[in-house]
Amino acid sequence: ELAECVGLSHGSIAIGASETALNLFLLDKLKEFHNTYPGIRLKIYNHSTPQAVEAVRRGTVDFAVVSTPVKADAPLHMTMLHPYQEILIGGTEFGHLAGKQTTFEEIMQYPLICLGKETVTFQFYRQLFASYGLDFEPDTETATADQILPLVRSGLGLAFIPKPMAKDAIDRGEVSEIRLCEKIPSRNICLIYDSKHPFKEAATQLKKMIAANSFASVE
């Protein structure tokens, strides 16, 4: 018990996290952990999902919390944590689209904003559009998820964004949800870790806290 107390009184944990995972899920867990174990230092690395998975594989982070779709081969272990739904939004310049249902083919005539080609979000939408025989070619690619909403508000184009991240801007009337005829598949926040990686007590405790109430586990 003494060793366990010492392990939770000081030390550090390295976490790879995508912005979406951080904003939609991880922040609340980190706050809870920090309040319980204030002596543990947290190192949060801003990674795309592929970067985070590679960091886990190399052992430069203890684990990662990222968005699907994600490929994690053994010995990496993936636990699904939290589902979320994305919606299409546009600024006031595209308000005429908000009052009707629109198809993927129809929105192709408008400028689109998305994360860069190296991200799983870009690949997710490229494959989704391809399933309808369409090429997904955004006019603007961003380096981070947090850049998308300001660009939409400024009228640079339409974008797909997690619904919780768009809620405040929608409520303020800065952007509008554009209803689609096609269904956007839901995505998930997931925990990735190396099952062969030895965890210190602090990392083990945070991992348990993050995975509490998770709904699926994949080896």
Residue ranges, per PLM feature:
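Short helix-loop hinge/linker segments at domain boundaries
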Residues: 1-14, 34-35, 73-78, 98, ...
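Flexible hinge/capping segments at coil-to-helix
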Residues: 7, 75-116
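Central regulatory/effector-binding core of bacterial HTH transcription factors
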Residues: 10-72, 142
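A late-sequence structural motif
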Residues: 25, 176-218
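Ligand-binding cleft/hinge of the Venus flytrap
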Residues: 30-37, 105, 122-135
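Hydrophobic hinge/microswitch elements
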Residues: 48-53, 57-61, 67, 124-178
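Short beta-strand->loop
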Residues: 77-87, 172-186
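Secondary-structure junction motif
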Residues: 111-132, 199-203, 207, 216-217
